[in-house]
Swiss-Prot record:
A Pfam short name: Jacalin
Listed PROSITE patterns: JACALIN_LECTIN (PS51752)
Protein name, UniProt field: Jacalin-related lectin 24
Organism this protein belongs to: Arabidopsis thaliana
Membership in a protein family: Belongs to the jacalin lectin family.
InterPro entries reported for this sequence: Jacalin-like_lectin_dom (IPR001229), Jacalin-like_lectin_dom_plant (IPR033734), Jacalin-like_lectin_dom_sf (IPR036404)
Amino acid sequence: MKSRNREMFKVGPIGSKQYYDKSWEEKGRNMISSIYVAFNKDSIKCIQFSYFHNGVHVVSEKHGSSKGQSYEIVRLNDDEYVTGLSGIFWERKVTSLTFHTNQGKHGPFCNGTGYSSSYMADYKKEIDVKIRDRREFGGFFGSFDDEFDGLTSIGIYVYPTYDNKPTLNQAWDPLYAFAHNQIPTIADGIPVMHIRYKPKLKDRIFSKLDFKRAMLCLIKVFLD
């Protein structure tokens, strides 16, 4: 677990933390089962999560004010996981929030500015880092003003994973295999992949021709 936390990095947040806001962390909590959202007509007031940790179902602390007038529960399917967020930050408050998953979107919750969507377009922010594996989502973080505004920021942790399985065409290219399987360098706590070999157009054409010839030979051997 220690190495996992060391390699995670923050993306976002939507919103902004002031010096008097309280920070909250749900780092490493990627097995989210439910998200509880409390809000009123103006802003998101409180957020809370339930998740599985070491085989046990755990409910997090409440992050924000308990003054919400409306409540929604986002229940994720067993094979559903968070991939991103979108929302609006207006007058020091998160006034709209949508959770993105591999199966769609949940929200928006609140939409409380009173202005048209076209007017608020410049204030909308989306966090989308193309997460396509549950392991890449590393939990949430954010801040809140408990006395007045509720939730003032929210972002996600991302945990890079590396898939070392090349495609069938790539498996025939030794230069690709060499570059693809290099161990990433850690720079300022963020894994940085080495520049991968990119063959010239003529080399790619000849490589594909060689691949086709090899496949034809295999088919011929099989038929014989």
